[in-house]
Swiss-Prot record:
Keywords: ATP-binding, Disease variant, Hydrolase, Membrane, Metal-binding, Metalloprotease, Mitochondrion, Mitochondrion inner membrane, Nucleotide-binding, Protease, Transit peptide, Transmembrane, Transmembrane helix, Zinc. It is found in: Mitochondrion inner membrane. The gene is Afg3l2. It comes from Mus musculus. One of its GO terms (biological process) is muscle cell development. This is Mitochondrial inner membrane m-AAA protease component AFG3L2.
């Protein structure tokens, strides 16, 4: 700035002369021309330099502005978002880059793939993350926006709370206190809703607030004001002027706030939606992501191992072999074998299909993708096929992997049962599933497992080899399998010190014929709950017996009130069952009989069925007679029958129809077999004629009548025994096998009751859990193991040579 002032002075722009302080010493004489010339030259040089500096700054700013890449195109510019910045140091010549780790990145967990399906969190803008349902509180910009928004709306609220709103008066107060006293300067009609009174200078009220009053309509106000001023004698220029103004008091902002909040909530809900909850980072969510799969990618997140699965060793071997296919394919490819595409696990509920899949996920050491069959179908058309495509695309990205579809019958039902909307969508989803499993776009290194307990309703195209090469049936465990399952579930329990786990597991296995793995787990859990209920320090054998009774018979109802006559009827009914079974050769051995109500029944009898898979006609007939023993006992001792035998009659009827319709055990109907309808199935037509149906009904009635007459004859002969058992039941309420032996003597037929007797002749006491030689290292990659062994052997060989 100084050199500019000097230049201005030297050109005559300053008439007052050069300030003395700016003149060098020795130049204050009369001849100041050399000094002025020096100063002029200095000022000229400095001005030119400043102009060049200013121009240089402008050009540099323009270049920086032009070099900034457009938003969204940063990666196409060398110094853009992905390019190397000028401030970053260049790599030295000859310096080698460190290799990037090629190992598998950590999975995002069970939320649908995690890191495999999303970008880095720090690279994403906070608004994009907020759209995807992620609340970006860790973002600095988001916190600043949130803070300023909160301050803005807080200021608005404070403004409206503390804003002076004046003092409201009535029309009468306005006339008497203000207009009649001549203190009104003018009236302002605001928004045609109220009138603000402006006072003449010096006449303002003491409180300093303005006053206002409401008006109904402008016309009425003007008419009343005109009449009032005439009455008060206010004429001409002295009349109060009326001004009409329109003001915005900001109340519309508050009125719009609920609407804005509702719209924001709806947009957030639509973008995230039910399908997007817990799946942040997978697209926009909600309606915009219905075509995305809801599958979960699991790896090293399941605690269930194969040691926790028992009672289905054959199925375990099959699943281990599938994992071995993925880990060591060379073992099979060298022999020309192809890796199977998949396997479907079938069997009754509770036998361990899903548990086996969980164990596979826990030990496979490959990505495990799980999805439910019902997750493919939604209310939108086309969602099912889209999710199937996305599911298999996810599987290909994670190959080699295992894909598990639980309850596949939800999407794999047979086609051709009508062309309704839902059925058509289900068929389209099934068609897409068939194409993805074995079509032109065949997946590689992806093993597909599926589970269902209704294989009879699956489409045949789904079950053919090439899609599901193997069908693995997992049935209820036998006595050895139950013993193994009990050992697994007894492991974490605190048992009494006098109990041995192996012996206890075998005894419980012999007491629970027909139990599935889920039933066994329930028994162990119930025993622990019963022990805790009684504040026991450990679980003893009595607790397990009570748990078995709880699972079989239901909850014991000791407080249920029975009339003495009803209790007596129940006692004779249960005594009839017990005595009939005691003297019938093929009936199941009795363990316990009780007249304490359990579940829906008023009495309870526990038997020990034999562990067998084939039944003769004589065995089925003896079981029918034992079941009818309760009704026969009522008729013999009371001369009447009650409704208590309804469940017994239902079981007898089912057994009779099964013998005649399914098993071909009737000479008149012949050696034929028809499928009986399942409970709850709609039967439109029978597979046989009306004449055959009439014949079947007649033979069923004859068979049941013969069994009833046989039971009547037996209990009439053993009437005294029935009465002894009934009287003791009324006295003790619960009888076990020892009580029956004391009353009736030993049972006249041989029977099996211990674990060792049941497994006699089967080769061993426990189930065979040995693995074939090819599956000894089923969970290890042999090539890597061999390389490690060679690397260990090489240094040893070098030492030996040296």
């Amino acid at each position: 700035m100084a050199h500019r002032c000097l230049l201005l002075w030297s050109r005559g722009g300053c008439r007052r002369g050069l300030p003395p302080l700016l003149v060098p010493r020795g130049c204050l004489g009369p001849d100041r021309r050399p000094c002025l010339r020096t100063l002029y030259q200095y000022a000229t040089v400095q001005t030119a330099s400043s102009r060049r500096s200013l121009l240089r700054d402008v050009i540099a700013a323009y270049q920086r502005f032009c070099s900034r890449p457009p938003k969204g195109f940063e990666k196409y510019f060398p110094n853009g978002k992905n390019g190397k910045k000028a401030s970053e140091p260049k790599e030295a010549v000859g310096e080698k880059k460190e290799p990037q780790p090629s190992g598998p990145q950590p999975s995002g967990g069970a939320g649908g793939g995690g890191g495999k399906r999303r970008g880095k969190k720090e690279d994403s803008h906070w608004w994009s993350r907020f759209q995807k349902g992620d609340f970006p509180w860790d973002d600095k910009d988001f916190r600043m926006y949130f803070l300023w928004t909160a301050l803005f709306w807080g200021g608005v609220m404070i403004y409206f709370v503390f804003k002076s709103s004046g003092r409201e008066i009535t029309w009468k107060d306005f006339v008497n206190n203000y207009l009649s006293k001549g203190v009104v300067d003018r009236l302002e009609v605001v928004n045609k809703r109220f009138v603000r009174v402006t006072f003449t200078p010096g006449k303002t009220p003491v409180d300093g607030q303005y006053v206002w009053f409401n008006i109904g309509s402008v016309d009425t106000f003007e008419r009343n004001l005109e009449t009032l001023q005439q009455e008060l004698g206010i004429e001409g220029e002295n009349r109060v002027p009326v001004v009409y103004i329109a003001e915005s008091d900001g109340s519309f902002l508050l009125s719009m706030l609920p609407t804005v909040l509702i719209i924001a909530f709806l947009l957030y809900t639509i973008r995230r939606g039910p399908a997007g909850i817990g799946r942040t980072g997978r697209g926009m969510g909600g309606l915009f992501s219905v075509g995305e799969t809801t599958a979960k990618v699991l790896k090293d997140e399941i605690d269930v191992k194969f040691k926790d699965v028992a009672g289905c060793e054959e199925a375990k071997l099959e699943i281990m072999e599938f994992v071995n296919f993925l880990k060591n394919p060379k073992q099979y490819q060298d022999l020309g074998a192809k890796i199977p595409k998949g396997a479907i696990l079938t069997g009754p509920p509770g036998t361990g299909k899903t548990l086996l899949a969980k164990a596979t996920a826990g030990e496979a050491n490959v990505p495990f993708i799980t999805v439910s069959g019902s997750e493919f179908l939604e209310m939108f058309v086309g969602v099912g096929p889209a999710r199937v495509r996305d599911l298999f695309a996810l599987a290909r990205k994670n190959a080699p992997c295992i894909l598990f579809i639980d309850e596949i019958d939800a999407v794999g039902r047979k086609r051709g049962r009508g062309n309704f909307g839902g059925q058509s969508e289900q068929e389209n989803t099934l068609n897409q599933l068939l194409v993805e499993m074995d079509g032109f776009n065949t997946t590689t290194n992806v093993v597909i497992l599926a589970g269902t307990n209704r294989p009879d309703i699956l489409d045949p195209a789904l079950l053919r080899p090439g899609r599901f090469d193997r069908q693995i049936f997992i049935g209820p465990p036998d006595i050895k399998g139950r013993a193994s399952i009990f050992k697994v579930h007894l492991r974490p329990l605190k048992l009494d010190s006098a109990l041995e786990k192996d012996k206890l597991a075998r005894k419980l296995a012999s007491l629970t014929p027909g139990f599935s793995g889920a039933d066994v787990a329930n028994v162990c859990n119930e025993a622990a709950l019963i022990a805790a209920r009684h504040l026991s320090d450990a679980i003893n054998e009595k607790h397990f017996e009570q748990a078995i009774e709880r699972v079989i018979g239901g909850l014991e109802k000791k407080t249920q009130v029975l009339q003495p006559e009803e209790k007596k009827t129940v006692a004779y009914h249960e005594a009839g069952h017990a005595v009939a079974g005691w003297y019938l050769e093929h009936a199941d051995p009795l363990l316990k009989v009780s007249i304490i109500p359990r579940g829906k029944g008023l009495g309870y009898a526990q038997y020990l069925p034999k562990e067998q898979y084939l039944y003769t006609k004589e065995q089925l007939l003896d079981r029918m007679c034992m079941t009818l023993g309760g009704r026969v006992s009522e008729e013999i001792f009371f001369g009447r029958i009650t409704t208590g035998a309804q469940d017994d009659l239902r079981k007898v009827t089912q057994s009779a129809y099964a013998q005649i319709v399914q098993f071909g055990m009737n000479e008149k109907v012949g050696q034929i077999s028809f499928d009986l309808p399942r409970q709850g199935d709609m039967v439109l037509e029978k597979p046989y004629s009306e004449a055959t149906a009439r014949m079947i009904d007649d033979e069923v009635r004859i068979l049941i009548s013969d069994a009833y007459r046989r039971t009547v004859a037996l209990l009439t002969e053993k009437k005294a025994d029935v009465e002894k058992v009934a009287l003791l039941l009324l006295e003790k309420e619960v009888l076990d096998k020892n009580d029956m032996v004391q009353l009736l003597g030993p049972r006249p037929f041989t029977e099996k009751s211990t674990y060792e007797e049941f497994v006699e002749g089967t080769g061993s006491l426990d189930e065979d859990t040995s693995l074939p030689e090819g599956l000894q290292d089923w969970n290890k990659e042999r090539e890597k193991e061999e390389k490690k062994e060679k690397e260990k052997e090489e240094p040893l060989n070098e030492k030996v040579v040296s």
